[in-house]
């Protein structure tokens, strides 16, 4: 786990607890997307370098997002500004999404294949994973031409490498002792 992930964890946890308490998970997801979109804008990055005061920086965010930002979001923006933590917004968002998935009993699966899979193949993979993990499954699918053939499935910290490249490596390792 990276340092940014470690720092982001308590922020995401606090935001998620507020979202659960107020039944506003989707709203908070949109707020986090909004804040990280503004913070990552190339014209806005100059402000994040510390050249302006945290109070003024907070005011800019709050002014831009008047229609989406409530009191709790204002407090988050002020806290991120005072602690100079806008650089970990992606980590906070990713952690928030993982907390939501866990709360809704969903696992997030990253699936990579050497070539494009049809939707019915992805659905078959989803069904197998749902039976295996006994949870609903959300698949994030990408084509990776670097994989010779087959696929790689990543669930949390577990990787199922079903690629030809991995099979060749295992064969090579077994022949080389």
Curated annotation (Swiss-Prot):
Annotated localization? Cell membrane
Which InterPro entries does this entry report, sorted A to Z? ATP_synth_OSCP/delta_N_sf (IPR026015), ATPase_OSCP/dsu (IPR000711)
Which ranges form a coiled coil?
none
Q: What is its main location?
A: membrane
Q: Which family does it belong to?
A: Belongs to the ATPase delta chain family.
Under the heading NCBIfam families, the entry gives: ATP_synt_delta, PRK05758.2-2
| Name this polypeptide is given | ATP synthase subunit delta
């Amino acid at each position: 786990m990276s340092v940014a992930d470690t720092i982001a964890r308590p922020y995401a946890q606090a935001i998620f607890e507020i979202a659960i308490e107020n039944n506003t998970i989707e709203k908070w997801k949109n707020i986090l997307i909004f804040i990280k979109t503004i913070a990552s804008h190339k014209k806005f990055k100059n402000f994040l370098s510390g050249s302006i005061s945290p109070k003024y920086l907070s005011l800019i965010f709050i002014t831009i997002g008047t229609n989406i930002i409530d009191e709790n979001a204002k407090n988050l923006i002020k806290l991120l500004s005072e602690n100079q933590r806008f650089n970990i917004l992606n980590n906070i968002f990713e952690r928030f999404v993982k907390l939501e998935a866990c709360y809704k009993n969903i696992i997030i699966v990253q699936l990579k294949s050497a070539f494009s899979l049809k939707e019915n193949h992805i659905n078959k993979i989803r069904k197998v994973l749902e039976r295996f993990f006994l949870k609903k499954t959300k698949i994030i699918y990408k084509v990776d031409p670097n994989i010779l053939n087959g696929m790689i499935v990543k669930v949390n910290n577990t990787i199922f490498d079903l690629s030809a490249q991995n099979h060749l490596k295992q064969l090579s390792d077994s022949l080389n002792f």
